[in-house]
């Protein structure tokens, strides 16, 4: 179990919310107070709610669910891509295409096209085309890679969405809600927490705050994955052991 400390949260600036004039009243339960026109998030609640979110993501990963990390704002792009890759999951960090979840079959066609273009470059098939055609295909691949590269290996809709700034990613959150996909999110003082299943109250604008919370969610995925692998291995060993016992029972004793 990865713990998050008050010291880590303070050092990363997770407690700084938005200006008091830019807030969503629904976030009032998560606000400690205001200082110099800025809302201060109640970090005691952040710690408690973070633990709930961490446990949920760990359990989901242990059950074999995939997690899609979403954060397309500039401050989140690097953390989202790097942490999702570190824990072997998927990400969207450039632009959310409408229907990415609700019309995944169509998006999958574009992913398959990207994979074909990758294969053409890898095996040299692209060399059979003219220079002009090669340039056109390379541009097409670059465009697809930018928007779909993070979900290239995702064969079906994810089991969980982890979102940085649900206000900015409202289409992604809306699609997840329609499909019944649980959403874990870093929710700042200007956000509506109603559509978020696991709210992590925190600063969703500071790079350090985003990195800290995103890396902890990646840790949760890794922890759940390790527990799943250990359980599967134990199950396989027990099955093998049982089969061995059956063989022994069926072998007649020597005279």
From Swiss-Prot:
Keywords associated with the record: Ribonucleoprotein, Ribosomal protein
Pfam families registered for this protein in UniProt: Ribosomal_S2 (PF00318)
A single GO molecular function term of this UniProt record: structural constituent of ribosome
Keyword Transcription regulation: no
Family: Belongs to the universal ribosomal protein uS2 family.
Species assigned in the record: Citrifermentans bemidjiense (strain ATCC BAA-1014 / DSM 16622 / JCM 12645 / Bem) (Geobacter bemidjiensis)
Protein name: Small ribosomal subunit protein uS2
Compositional bias segments (type: Acidic residues): 236-255
Source taxon at top rank: Bacteria
PROSITE patterns (alphabetical): RIBOSOMAL_S2_1 (PS00962), RIBOSOMAL_S2_2 (PS00963)
GO cellular component entries: cytosolic small ribosomal subunit
Residue ranges, annotated region (Disordered): 231-255
One GO term (biological process): translation
